[in-house]
């Protein structure tokens, strides 16, 4: 059964991403576009527009040809938007790297995308230069002063402010080559056209519109799909002002909300967790906040409710993949209350099926199955990897997400877990996210993750890694979960740790914990 959005279809304009995002820039002049929270430095819309034109002109003068790749390896800074849209305006394609990537990780992405240019900042220059050398990147730029092997970014902006005249087909030409998370091996390059990224923004705006008076704070990284699409492009399209953070620190985050009177938080579950449970929250004036939006990973009903009750504000979710150009569903910002634990409702122009993973047959309405989606925001495939593309994108245009979901009778979507992350306990499928939601509701638990431990008798047993808020015994937590789930879904062991490994986007890096479990089993065997 094909499920369609409850919202009427929207028109997707036939324009490039910069044309769409920057359509109203000339009318905004001295209005702040991006505020660097760490320094207080402000980039106005006039400065943004001029910087983008200069960047495009500079890249053309340096030899960037349409379709060639410009890489950005930096945290959330105003120059990110200048470089991103400057490269696209010049006809280039952008790939974004985590500034915390190792030399090998960065070199892999640079080589895989055939990047010709790379922009970074001084603290990451050594890694960037080593990676660029391994990958054959021709030119490296750095913010601030030039350094050995790297030109100053300001030099790139010194070739006038007339962008090159390039022809871009929004439906065919790529805007971004973004890497999948890489939590299970080397990442894959996700090919996204201008039209796909424009479609995602138009669709999301139907459910969650932004106005020019908004002042969201965005701790999630711009190099991540959610950060650049919502924290940067959606905000700039609306003519709003975004307050950025180079990294998340709870005290700095709260202070910035108070200082800049932020109206919204664009975050991920760890940020919602801090707002719901951290004692520092009570020391700051957060009365300007109107909403909190969480993405990048599932947010439990308990945590969503706890945050909403503490702040007295709307707390919603959005769901999507890099492969879906950002968005599949979102909590509507239309006055109705968010449904706790739900990732919202399908955005317009999007179709979905919920299927039995092994057969592809549709499951009965309201039951759990793998989510397949189809819409104009989807990727065209994985770069240079037709085999991997064929595994997830079928001939009828359905993207097989690998996520287990259910969609209720009212059209609200609930993410149950990743198909590949299910723990197989004596033939039963155990969803780690369900157990994490239960454990996260315990007052002594600050953070947690659940993975499978190889077991000769059971196949795998669920093991909880827990960061304690206060003293608590593992047996108490095991009993707490056992009282709330069926026997196959009980946690069988608890490991206390100082922190849960997460990606910069807030996703639990289960591979690290799973590797630890496999290593422990080998040592004990």
Question: In which residue ranges do the predicted regions lie?
Answer:
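Conserved pre-ATP/AMP-binding loop-to-beta segment of ANL
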Residues: 12-14, 29-30, 148, 160-179, ...
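Conserved AMP-binding A3 loop
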Residues: 42-46, 175-199
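AMP-binding/adenylate-forming catalytic core of the ANL superfamily
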Residues: 101, 118-120, 265, 375, ...
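Gly/Ser/Thr-rich phosphate-binding loop
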Residues: 237, 254, 259-266, 276-338, ...
């Amino acid at each position: 059964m094909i499920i369609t959005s409850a919202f009427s279809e929207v028109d997707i304009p036939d324009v490039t991403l910069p044309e769409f995002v920057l359509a109203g820039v000339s009318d905004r002049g001295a209005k702040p576009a991006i505020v660097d929270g760490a320094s207080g430095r402000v980039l106005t819309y006039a400065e943004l527009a001029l910087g983008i034109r200069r960047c495009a002109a500079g890249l053309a003068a340096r030899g960037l040809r349409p379709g060639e790749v410009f890489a950005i390896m930096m945290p959330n800074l105003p120059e990110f938007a200048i470089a991103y849209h400057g490269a696209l305006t010049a006809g280039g394609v952008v790939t974004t790297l985590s500034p915390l990537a190792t030399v090998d990780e960065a070199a892999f992405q640079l080589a895989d995308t055939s990047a010709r240019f790379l922009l970074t900042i001084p603290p990451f220059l050594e890694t960037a230069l080593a990676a660029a050398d391994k990958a054959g990147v021709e030119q490296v730029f750095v913010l601030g002063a030039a350094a050995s092997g790297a030109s100053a970014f300001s030099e790139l902006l010194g070739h006038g402010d007339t962008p090159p005249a390039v022809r871009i087909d929004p439906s065919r030409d790529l805007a971004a080559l973004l890497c999948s998370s890489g939590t299970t091996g080397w990442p894959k390059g996700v090919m996204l056209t201008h039209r796909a990224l424009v479609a995602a923004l138009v669709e999301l705006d139907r459910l969650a519109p932004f106005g020019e008076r908004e002042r969201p704070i965005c701790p999630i990284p711009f190099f991540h799909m959610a950060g650049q699409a919502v924290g940067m492009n959606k905000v700039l399209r609306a003519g709003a002002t975004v307050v950025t953070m180079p990294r998340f620190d709870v005290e700095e985050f709260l202070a910035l909300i108070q200082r800049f009177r932020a109206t919204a938080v664009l975050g991920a579950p760890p940020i919602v967790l801090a707002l719901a449970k951290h004692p520092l929250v009570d020391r700051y004036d957060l009365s300007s906040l109107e909403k909190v939006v969480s993405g990048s990973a599932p947010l439990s009903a308990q945590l969503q409710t706890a945050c909403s009750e503490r702040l007295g504000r709307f707390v919603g979710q959005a769901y999507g993949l890099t492969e879906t150009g950002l968005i599949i569903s979102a909590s509507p910002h239309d006055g109705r209350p968010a449904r706790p634990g739900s990732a919202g409702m399908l955005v317009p122009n999007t179709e979905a099926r919920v299927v039995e993973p092994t057969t592809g047959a549709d499951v009965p309405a309201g039951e759990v199955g793998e989510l397949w989606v189809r819409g104009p925001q989807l990727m065209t495939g994985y770069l240079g990897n037709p085999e991997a593309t064929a595994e997830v994108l079928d001939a009828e245009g359905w993207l097989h997400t690998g996520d287990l979901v259910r969609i209720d009778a009212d059209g609200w979507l609930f993410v149950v877990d990743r198909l590949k992350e299910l723990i197989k306990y004596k033939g039963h499928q155990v969803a780690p996210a369900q157990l994490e939601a239960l454990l996260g509701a315990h007052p002594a638990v600050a953070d947690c993750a659940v993975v499978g431990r190889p077991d000769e008798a059971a196949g795998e047993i669920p093991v909880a890694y827990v960061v304690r808020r206060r003293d608590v015994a593992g047996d108490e937590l095991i009993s707490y979960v056992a009282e709330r789930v069926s026997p196959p879904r009980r946690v069988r062991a608890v490991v206390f740790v100082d922190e849960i490994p997460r990606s910069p986007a807030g996703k639990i890096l289960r591979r690290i914990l799973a590797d630890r479990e496999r290593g422990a089993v080998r040592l004990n065997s």
